[in-house]
């Protein structure tokens, strides 16, 4: 099982546009072979100690894939790459953690 936590920081004032761009591809990504979960999240001010600082511009994509090959197929898909190039100007920063289950 592969988990992905992709933190995307939108340019100031462009978070909603970025969210809408991701919502547009949700059905296609969720239909891909090996995709078990693909969802959008935003920061929640919880007041809990240890939480990362709140940033209203961050959109986090939470993904679950059956294996690394399925994730690679998604990332290397030409339609996804074309879409990503179109939304890249909305992004100030992006980082991705790729995790594997150990239990």
Feature annotation, model-predicted:
Residues 49-54:
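Short glycine-biased active-site loop of nucleotidyltransferases that positions the nucleotide triphosphate
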Residues 11-12, 69:
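Active-site acidic-Proline motif in GNAT/NAT acetyltransferases
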Residues 13-18:
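Short, conserved charged micro-motifs
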Residues 1-2, 103:
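Absolute protein N-terminus
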Residues 24-36, 55-98:
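An amphipathic, aromatic/His-enriched active-site/gating alpha helix that lines ligand/cofactor pockets
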Residues 3-8:
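Active-site-flanking beta-strand signature of metal-NTP-handling nucleotidyl enzymes
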Residues 44-47:
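Carbohydrate-binding/catalytic loop surfaces
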